[in-house]
From Swiss-Prot:
UniProt feature coiled coil, ranges: none
Record keyword Translocase present: no
HAMAP family from the UniProt entry: ATP_synth_delta_bact
Name of the protein described by the UniProt record: ATP synthase subunit delta
Family listed: Belongs to the ATPase delta chain family.
Organism of this sequence: Mesomycoplasma hyopneumoniae (strain J / ATCC 25934 / NCTC 10110) (Mycoplasma hyopneumoniae)
Assembly behavior: F-type ATPases have 2 components, F(1) - the catalytic core - and F(0) - the membrane proton channel. F(1) has five subunits: alpha(3), beta(3), gamma(1), delta(1), epsilon(1). F(0) has three main subunits: a(1), b(2) and c(10-14). The alpha and beta chains form an alternating ring which encloses part of the gamma chain. F(1) is attached to F(0) by a central stalk formed by the gamma and epsilon chains, while a peripheral stalk is formed by the delta and b chains.
Molecular function (Gene Ontology), one example: proton-transporting ATP synthase activity, rotational mechanism
Gene designation: atpH
Keywords recorded for this protein, A-Z: ATP synthesis, Cell membrane, CF(1), Hydrogen ion transport, Ion transport, Membrane, Transport
Subcellular location: Cell membrane
GO cellular component, one term: plasma membrane
Cysteine disulfide links: none
Amino acid sequence: MYLYKKNYYGYAESLLDISISENNVEKYINDCFFILSIIQNNQVLILLFKSHFIGKQEKFNIIDKIFSAKIEKILVNFLKVIAKNNLFLYYKQILLKYIKLANSHLSQTWGEIETAFPISSVMTSSFESILSKKLGKKVHLRHKINSKLISGIRIIVDNQIFENSLFSELKLLKQNLKKHLITKNDL
């Protein structure tokens, strides 16, 4: 497993070198998020690209059909290389490692803002600004609707969770009630 880990980190580092040399790091980050989203929403693609019953050229044609008009040509070719080398199973780790390296290069980070309802881009920008000051680096947020929140927001940046929602309040209340019941039963 370590050998594969080293390999796919090498792929991410190579992609970073290319994006830096092309002065296109930010565009590649956005394209990587797009790729992750497409494959996440179409899990059958993973099975297709890791299958030994489908020829390499057929896989390349599928990659072209899905991605050619939407992302940089270098990234299309990059996907073909990992498919050719039977590393498509690790596409997510490779792309996430690239995003992490690229963010470090740009002194920025990405996070997710979850709400129970749609919010404006102005509000998202406001949260980005506040978090950028708090964390000391540029923060970009991607919006996601999470119906479990009921109301309020949850922001996740660099494994830190900033939350103010009815869901978190109910969860805390439930924990306190359990704790209270356990203590009462011990008496």
